[in-house]
From Swiss-Prot:
Record keywords: Cytoplasm, DNA-binding, Transcription, Transcription regulation
InterPro entries: Integrase-like_N, TACO1_YebC-like_2nd/3rd_dom, TACO1_YebC_N, Transcrip_reg_TACO1-like, Transcrip_reg_TACO1-like_dom3, YebC-like
Organism: Ligilactobacillus salivarius (strain UCC118) (Lactobacillus salivarius)
Any GO CC annotation of this UniProt entry: cytosol
Renumbered residue ranges of the record's region Disordered: 1-21
Keyword tRNA-binding: no
Presence of keyword Cytoplasm: yes
Protein name, UniProt field: Probable transcriptional regulatory protein LSL_0422
One example GO MF annotation: DNA binding
The family this protein is said to belong to: Belongs to the TACO1 family.
One Pfam short name: TACO1_YebC_N
Length: 242
């Protein structure tokens, strides 16, 4: 683990994501639809659906939206989506992974390539940067009003099955094996309010972003996240603190 705080980058994107909440709901609905269609509509028998429903609730997505996406998946017909990952580099040599759900791979590839080209990036071949990331479970617990020291939190994390704990003045950040994520989350949830809990891609090393590249890189990330077919964007960027 690189030791870099993922929380810092999450908070840096929060306001922009709040402004795009409708589009976020649309993307999560597509994820729910695809997973429910392939693995069944019952979250008890479909762990992947359960995780995405948790993601929907964390985004404050209305229950009716979740139900509509599941109901749509149980009907006949409907679009067939496939998962595709695009890999490339952004300004300052930052590695970027783009996960997409699409029913038209040519449309999506063209849009993603254009975003890279127009914003100082370069779309690479499959495998060009994915080896720089590890799949992990990620849990954040805000420290505000929390009367727990690092030693106690470390003990609780290890007991729950977590792999790593990183601490700052603002937050405890826990990383898990992806297969153990749900169990660790459920165990920690018994004692703490979780600010964030998700499966993610964690860079093995981060790239400090120079001040003169911040705006261009952020614009590239924003453009990619704005694409209807793009579900997640992961980077190795270490943005400077404001």
């Amino acid at each position: 683990m690189s030791g870099h705080s993922k929380w810092h980058n999450i908070q840096g994107r929060k306001n922009a994501q709040d402004a795009k909440r409708g589009k976020i709901f649309q993307k999560i609905s597509r994820e729910i639809y695809m997973v429910a269609k392939s693995g069944g509509p019952d979250p008890d028998g479909n762990p992947q659906l359960r995780l995405i429903m948790d993601k929907a609730r964390a985004a404050n997505m209305p229950k009716d939206n979740i139900k509509r996406a599941i109901d749509k998946a149980t009907g006949t017909g409907g679009a067939d989506y496939e998962e595709i990952t695009y890999e490339g580099y952004g300004p300052a040599g930052v590695a970027i992974l783009v996960h997409a759900l699409t029913d038209n791979r040519n449309r999506t590839a063209s849009a993603v390539r254009a975003d890279f080209n127009r914003n100082g990036g370069n779309l690479g071949e499959t495998g060009s940067v994915s080896f720089m990331f590890d799949r992990k479970g990620y849990i954040a617990i805000a420290r505000e009003d929390l009367e727990v020291d690092e030693d106690q939190m470390f003990e609780d994390v290890i007991e729950a099955g977590g792999e790593d704990l990183q601490t700052s003045d603002e937050v405890f950040e826990i990383y898990t094996d992806p297969k153990a994520f749900a169990d660790v989350r459920d165990e920690l949830q018994k004692k703490y309010d979780l600010a964030t809990a998700e499966l993610t891609m964690v860079p093995q090393n981060t790239v400090p972003v120079p001040a003169d590249k911040v705006e261009q890189l952020q614009r590239l990330i924003d453009r990619l996240e704005d694409e209807d077919d793009v579900s997640e964007v992961y980077t190795s960027a270490d943005f400077p603190e404001d």
